[in-house]
Each structure stands twice: as structure tokens, then as C-alpha cells.
């Protein structure tokens, strides 16, 4: 789970400078183009850091064709960040929804292919930072083992030893008295 999150966040860090900002009026339809090759997986990134796959959501609000994501009849709920990746290349969009009466400002688009050379060192440093964050957020092993844990482990070990000794005792006693039949296996009716 952590590796998937690190992959998604590091991919987002790699395309931060290649983000396309789109201003879309309410009620329109917008198509986000994904990378050219391969099957594209689309993610929606929420302000609280959560992720969702719009193509997997029920309803007819989002339409996916394997490469492009089409958002139909946009409302203010669809405003936010959308990220498409084929796990080799990726594109990132910031959709800003404006009222239908407001004229849309000029669209500024940055190509992710032109930003690749400059983002490689930044991506590497971002990935290292993400790995450090993931390791620091994980629960560190305590230096001392709690007494309750020691008690539980001791009880389990003692129980297993008692069961083992009972089995050994039964096996040894049964061999000494071979003429005796096993009462549990004797089915004389």
C-alpha cells in the first residue's frame, strides 16, 4: 500500500512542472487527453490527499476510452486535479470550473514532454524525500518488549510443550504394551 502511494505521489512530483491548467465553464464537457501509448489509468486527487479512479465510479459523469477521460456536464464538484498515467508517461490536469456567464481566461498548457529533462533531478530528490517520509511515518519497533507480550508468548510455549509431552507419553506407553488394544480404536459392538 505504501509503495503504491509513493509511486503515485512521486509520479505527481515528476509532472508538477508539466501540469495543464484548464478553465472550464459549468455545464460543458471536457476531454482530458492521456499519454499516447498504452492503457491509461486516471486518478482524481482530492484536496485532503485522497485518491479516486473516476473511470470506476458508477454513473455517466465520467467516460473513459482507455486513453482519454471525458467529464460530462461539469459542475463545481468536478473541479480539481486529474492525473493520467500508463506507468511510463503521465499527464496532470488542474481543472478550474467557472460560472457559464464568465468568460474563460486564456488557457495555459505546459507539455510534460518538454519538462522531462529538467524534472529528472527534481523527481529523484522528491522520491528520496517521499521514501524518508514513508519510513519516518511507519511505526518504529519498541526497544523493550511489553510484559503482557512476554506472558502471552510464554503461555503459548508452555501449552505446546505440555501437548508435545502428552503425545510422547502416549506413544511410549502404547509401545510398551503392544498387547493392549487402543480403547479409542476398538469398535466391538
UniProtKB/Swiss-Prot annotation:
Keywords: Early protein, Glycoprotein. It comes from the Viruses. Pfam families: Adeno_E3_CR1, Adeno_E3_CR2. Glycans are attached at residues 73, 137. E3 proteins seem to be dispensable for virus growth in tissue culture cells. They are potentially important for virus growth under special conditions; E3 region may help adenoviruses to evade the immune surveillance of the host. Belongs to the adenoviridae E3_20 family. This is Early E3 20.5 kDa glycoprotein. It comes from Human adenovirus B serotype 7 (HAdV-7). The lineage of its organism: Viruses, Varidnaviria, Bamfordvirae, Preplasmiviricota, Tectiliviricetes.
